[in-house]
């Protein structure tokens, strides 16, 4: 999961920055959206690389509260305000007061929740590392991929944005080429897995595939997470269509690439397609 991995790397980059400024030993981290696919992926990808002894509160909306997260590094972890049972932590319901005493808040909750709680996080003195699209194009919010523009972490005003997954894997490949010779144009086609649509999308792929193989017709299949049947199909429609008939996913790749690379003159043409694969986005990139 490129978004979870990148959020983790931004987290570590921020930890290094806070430590270099004399932050206390043992930073407190809060993970908002712990019970969802993005938050859970972020939890797994961090492994034991988080500074030992740091608190790791798991926070979620009302639906996810009470969910078990699992032991961290194979050990029980005593976390402030959380119940640590045999084999795991219990997720708490998130509220504005959840971020008191937290240094870094990892958000994987969706844009609406991130916008709603931004003020509470920053007022508590924490740094929000946000996995949603809420702040990516805000001028005062750095959009960071550590392998590409790690220095941008330094100018945050309390929020650091994590790019779209399809943008992340592309700019990581573009950066060393750009360092050799400035890039003029990029044509990219993406083949994006169901995981990009979250747990409901993956469940729908599984269910539809099973139903299709059992002989059900298109009319009998349940279609809710995608615009069309995803089983044995490719859908060139990720997010909503815009006025120029491109999709918002394609627009994200264009504008995010320019911001991350620090070059508004790069021309980017993107075609984004959802494919019937559980995990693993693929891209074909032509670079001039």
Where are these regions (language model features)?
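Oxyanion-binding "anion nests"
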Residues: 227-278
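Conserved glycine-rich beta-strand-loop-beta hairpin in the small C-terminal domain of fold type I
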Residues: 279-283
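N-terminal Rossmann-like NAD(P) cofactor-binding subdomain of oxidoreductases
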Residues: 16-230, 266-267
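Short hydrophobic/aromatic beta-strand micro-patches
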Residues: 286-288
């Amino acid at each position: 999961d490129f978004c979870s991995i990148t959020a983790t790397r931004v987290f570590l980059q921020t930890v290094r920055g806070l430590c270099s400024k004399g932050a206390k030993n043992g930073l407190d981290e809060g993970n908002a959206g712990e019970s969802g696919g993005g938050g859970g992926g972020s939890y797994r990808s961090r492994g034991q690389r988080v500074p030992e002894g740091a608190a790791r509160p798991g926070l979620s909306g009302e639906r996810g509260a009470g969910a078990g997260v699992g032991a961290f590094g194979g050990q029980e972890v005593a976390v402030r305000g959380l119940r640590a049972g045999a084999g795991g932590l219990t997720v708490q319901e998130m509220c504005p007061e959840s971020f008191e005493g937290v240094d870094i808040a990892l958000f994987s909750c969706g844009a609406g929740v991130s916008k709603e709680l931004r003020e509470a996080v920053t007022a508590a003195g924490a740094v929000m590392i946000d996995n949603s699209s809420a702040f990516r194009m805000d001028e005062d919010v750095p959009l960071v991929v550590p392998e590409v523009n790690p220095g941008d972490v330094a100018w945050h005003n309390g929020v650091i944005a994590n790019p779209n997954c399809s943008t992340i894997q592309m700019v990581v490949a573009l950066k060393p080429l750009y360092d050799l010779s400035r890039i003029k144009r990029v044509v990219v086609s993406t083949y994006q897995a169901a995981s990009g649509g979250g747990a409901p999308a993956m469940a729908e792929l599984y269910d539809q595939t099973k139903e299709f193989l059992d002989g059900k017709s298109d009319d009998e299949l349940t279609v809710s997470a995608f615009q069309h049947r995803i089983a044995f199909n490719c859908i060139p429609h990720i997010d909503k269509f815009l006025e120029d008939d491109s999709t918002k996913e394609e627009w994200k790749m264009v504008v995010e690439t320019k911001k991350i690379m620090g070059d508004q003159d790069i021309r980017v043409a993107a075609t984004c397609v959802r494919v019937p694969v559980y995990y693993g986005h693929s891209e074909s990139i032509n670079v001039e």
